[in-house]
Amino acid sequence: MQRSPLEKASVLSKLFFSWTRPILIKGYRQRLELSDIYQVPSTDSADHLSEKLEREWDRELASKKNPKLINALRRCFFWRFAFYGILLYLGEVTKAVQPLLLGRIIASYDPDNKQERSIAIYLAIGLCLLFIMRPLLLHPAIFGLHHIGMQIRIAMFSLIYKKTLKLSSRVLDKISIGQLVSLLSNNLNKFDEGLALAHFVWIAPLQVTLLMGLLWDLLQASAFCGLAFLIVLALVQAGLGRMIMKYRDQRAGKINERLVITSEVIENIQSVKAYCWEEAMEKIIENIRQTELKLTRKAAHVRYFNSSAFFFSGFFVVSLSVLPYALIKTIILRKIFTTISFCIVLRMAVTRQFPWAVQTWYDSLGAINKIQDFLQKQEYKTLEYNLTTTEVMMENVTAFWEEGFGELLEKAKENSNDRKISNGDNSLFFSNFSLLGTPVLKDINFKIERGQLLAVAGSTGAGKTSLLMMIMGELEPSEGKIKHSGRISFCSQFSWIMPGTIKENIIFGVSYDEYRYRSVIKACQLEEDISKFAEKDNIVLGEGGVTLSGGQRARISLARAVYKDADLYLLDSPFGYLDVLTEKEIFESCVCKLMANKTRILVTSKMEHLKKADKVLILHEGSCYFYGTFSELQSLRPDFSSKLMGYDSFDQFSPERRNSIITETLRRFSLEGDAAVPWNETKKQSFKQTGEFGEKRKNSILNPINSIRKFSIVQKTPLPMNGIEGESEVPVERRLSLFPDCEQGEAILPRSNMINTGPTLRRQRRQSVLNLMTRSSVNQGQSIHRRTTASTRKMSLAPQANLTEMDIYSRRLSQDSGLEISEEINEEDLKECFFDDVESIPPVTTWNTYLRYITVHKNLIFVLIWCLVIFLAEVAVSLVVLWILRNLSSQDKGNSTQSVNSSYAVIFTSTSAYYIFYIYVGVADTLLALGLFRGLPLVHTLITVSKILHHKMLHSVLQAPMSTLNTLKAGGILNRFSKDIAILDDLLPLTIFDFIQLLLIVIGAVAVVSVLQPYIFLATVPVIAAFIILRAYFLHTSQQLKQLESEGRSPIFTHLLTSLKGLWTLRAFGRQPYFETLFHKALNLHTANWFLYLSTLRWFQMRMEIIFVIFFIAVTFISILTTGEGEGTVGIILTLAMNIMGTLQWAVNSSIEVDSLMRSVSRVFKFIDMPTEESKPPTKSFKPSKDAQLSKVTITENRHVREDDIWPSGGQMTVKDLTAKYIDGGNAILENISFSISPGQRVGLLGRTGSGKSTLLSALLRLVNTEGEIQIDGVSWDSIPLQEWRRAFGVIPQKVFIFSGTFRKNLDPYGQWNDQEIWKVADEVGLRSVIEQFPGKLDFVLVDGGYVLSHGHKQLMCLARSVLRKAKILLLDEPSAHLDPITYQIIRRTLKQAFADCTVILSEHRIEAMLECQRFLVIEDSRLRQFESIQRLLSERSAFRQAIGPPERPGLLPHRLSSRQRSPSRIAALKEETEDEVQDTRL
């Protein structure tokens, strides 16, 4: 970045914003890059501003019992805010005084007032000086207020981010992602956008008082008639605003409903294509869109009337002010024209400035209160550690994730005193009222010495991760003691990758030691993976590691934990995503050898790990089931495998444990009852859900499902929501900001769960921050990286003692025992970390885009032509009236000497000039009112255009090949359907209408002035030309700066979400300061772009003002020097010239806004033009069968099969020379794969993580770019339509897809099967008992990815889909990942029964599942290495043989035979359900 010219700019350069000229020239000539942007001034840096506000906020916290954030802001920014307010007031005063001088100039042409004629030239000079002074006062004031608003936002951003890193996990569990992002985006944007209007809350009343005093002098009491009309108009507009809000709130639910399903489809587009659900998903989304558009049109019509009311209100204001006075007294032209000018200023103050200012203060104070509540929330407390201790010990430790009853009761008592819930937690008491819950850990005791390995095991939800969280201090124990040194390293269950290189992710700020680093790389089996990258370990990883496989991410996370020199290593299931061989090697070389001298706590479920552990701790339902050595475990607890693997029979469950996921669902939502109902007098259970109830995660480490808290009590009436916990104006439906860079109000969307007709749990589902931290899926992110510079700070750590020379942790690069942690980031490299790829859209919207947009709907062209015809009629009538006016004015001038009272003084004389002028005003405004009929069809048609574009874009995305979609980010696609469609629906129609209307007004005004005084036309032409040239010059740079600003906003929120995902890791490594620095750098990058955009915008506005001032000076002196005694002519010219200024500037600004909004249209067109998948039309050889099943095709003419056979009939598959690529022109993931599978054969896929097993399954479905040939039952994939080919397969993907809709829709989106068939299949796969527990059963609506279902239930849903389709070939991609044992056994049983005659291709890490396969396909280095039977693989050197230890090999085949006998006993309990109790399959 370059140094800013502002630092050396002169006073005049700052006043006229001339210092921005270099960037404007560069932006006009070429595309701007980040390196072209000027550096942020030190006074605007995030470090400086955050430190300034943080210091005042700490002072406020220390000095007062009830601290106020607004007091801290006042001490930081008040005096500058007040100074710019005074400048703004002076600028507005000049505007109010201008009509006085105008009236004096008009009066100087009165024949009875020749005395004034001599000073007309001086009055004109004074009027011109006022026009010159106004921009010199106004623009610096507006820029200064925008600048202060920007500084407040930056300081608040930083304060919120720092607070977020300090929040306790308990608080994070209560805050949703949407609330946090909304707090940063929508709330804080109010300071940026609204601070310039804040002063009008006092300026507008003073201005109205001044104007009414001046009008009283002209019209006496009748002036208040116009004011009364304006007040009534303001109230009417407020009422229309309420109607708009009502329609918007109704529509917001539908928008969110559409976006939820669209988001689910985009994130799972590969599954959608694999299931051939493109048409079904398109129909579901379009049905919701239809309802949404009905509400959109209603809201647009009301907004249209609201906008039009302002335009034609001027006539009524002037009429109501002048007519009462004229009925009593005579009125002269000077008073009419002065009144018109006064009323224009008065109308703006009453109907625009004051209401906007009030709304600004309301929104700003609300945002400040929310942020204040957030800043006072409970922080994460580090435990007190003894750095000299060498042991890890727990004594009688009990812990709850939820707050206890005592805390809640005390909080309720405190809050009831002032009838106010502090910290925004007003729903906290009721949402947790009965949720005392089961302790997540209770009476835990263990002790391990230095260098020992403790293996922690237990079924799902037993409390294993909570145990680690308690050691780290994330979970505060309610009882007992914890003892350890505090020097901890942590590896999360769900791998977290920060944007950067592999090397940076592993070192993570610790001083670099080559020997240690290489040892860790080798021990974590990363050498081979790194060697495949051209950049080796300097390869850039995207946010979340999206370019890596799950196993690679897991190994990098483990390497990060191992590299750090700590006393205690907490490893939370680090091998979950690894294949058997890799897991075994890493456990031996890393955990057992490399870390042999370190204290380790490993969460695992593998028997081999337990055997090699020094101590074993088995948890069951939060309690210590066993603690001791493995040999003691075998002798004392022979049934330990049931606790470890979750094989408890139903009858052995405790009463609490018997409650299934459905009972937990009941707990989550509500029992209908009054808030005052005693705990033992709850009413009948109901699934009716209230919005104020605490929203829980679907899949959190806290796992409330396994905490088993059965009941809840909530109020019937919605509780008010304040603070970050909810929006006060929407008590039932939480407002959620999905897209932080969306500037529209509709971006804050209340959640609606009514996706389809049928029962649903009507609760505002949110994803808590804690859930984000514990999600296993990797979100799409930016695939660029960040490097650090050499500037570092030291963090002293206690040195290790008694280590051997071979111990990697004894080595130090530096002389002391400190760790070097980098705090500096280069801004250029930061762009590589987070920035999206720059969109290839021209700086200015092309004419081709406008033409294409206009021709989308044929009616739009006719509407525009009709608007033009009406405008020509307006101009014609106006010109006729003006000619009459001029002729009658000349007649009156001749008769004026014979009249007792001059015709200029009597308003009702039919031949008077001002009466004709009054007729003209009436006719012109009447025609303007006809704009209602002109503009309404335009707005209506533009919304229809938006509907068509949305439909085309949705169809294009669903039909696009995966090779194209793989190059796009899910967030970018979703932005097209959210932000850009919102712009097309809401902003673009009314903005286009405003621009057209303003343009016509300007053209009409210029025509009137030119007819009255042709000389003025000579001044008008160059002024309009100058405006057009200036607009084009500014537009090139401003649009690029706006694009850079938008791109710069993304890293801020990306970094926030990245930090939250890895918050536990950050705290464990003490990396908060570094990430705060990184966040400040991201803020500074955005600030640099935004500040430059504000400055160039002021430059443009100032130049427009200068051009107008020159124009007005020319008009004024031409009128005075060339006009005779035409008082009416001078009044019309000067009045219209003053109006031209504001209207023309408004029109130019509207044209710039239209151009900016049309960029959304360009992006939509770009998506519409995406290529489609190669889907050959059905040939005469293939016809859909009369059977309703889409997975079957009747073969009528094919040499491979007999006539009238159903395809596929056997499932025989032949693959020849298959090569697969994810992206056109990319590297081949698979090369020359050839094999043949017999009908009904089961084939297992073997290979290291990332070897291409999932890619092979995708290639079979033609989801990736493929070369070669595949045949099924003799039919080649080249001779069959793509959709029919995919319907031949049944798929259970690695990433389960459950969209928002009913059970029936999720199982059968096309509605092909009746209920009886669906229930039969549900019974086969073990889903009947689950579905029957929900109200509405098959019509129960699942939302948010089916969060009320366990992962196992979701897998069973996928299995049921394949059974319904009667697929002959089944593809399974790691179906047992994260499955509880019982669901796993159900899937195995179903595969044996329902798919006994089907061909099965299985990618799996569990050895037991692979033993069901007859043959194995081994993939290595993108090629097929082996395709053999299990006996052959065990008899030779292979990866499969290496993964199985010699002692276990003899038992493999007998185990395969006996597994069929044991399975029924483990799943027998599935059918022992009663009406009140259902087995919990999430063990």
UniProtKB/Swiss-Prot annotation:
Enzyme Commission (EC) number: 5.6.1.6
InterPro entries found in the cross-reference section: AAA+_ATPase, ABC1_TM_dom, ABC1_TM_sf, ABC_transporter-like_ATP-bd, ABC_transporter-like_CS, ABC_transporter_C-like, CFTR/ABCC7, CFTR1_ATP-bd_dom1
Topology Extracellular: residue spans: 99-122, 217-222, 320-339, 881-919, 1013-1014, 1118-1131
Organism of derivation: Canis lupus familiaris (Dog)
Residues of the ABC transmembrane type-1 domain: 81-365, 860-1156
GO CC terms of this entry: apical plasma membrane; chloride channel complex; cytosol; early endosome; early endosome membrane; endoplasmic reticulum membrane; membrane; nucleus
Alphabetically ordered keywords of this record: ATP-binding, Cell membrane, Chloride, Chloride channel, Endoplasmic reticulum, Endosome, Glycoprotein, Ion channel, Ion transport, Isomerase, Isopeptide bond, Lipoprotein, Membrane, Nucleotide-binding, Nucleus, Palmitate, Phosphoprotein, Repeat, Transmembrane, Transmembrane helix, Transport, Ubl conjugation
Protein name, as recorded: Cystic fibrosis transmembrane conductance regulator
Gene transcribed to yield this protein: CFTR
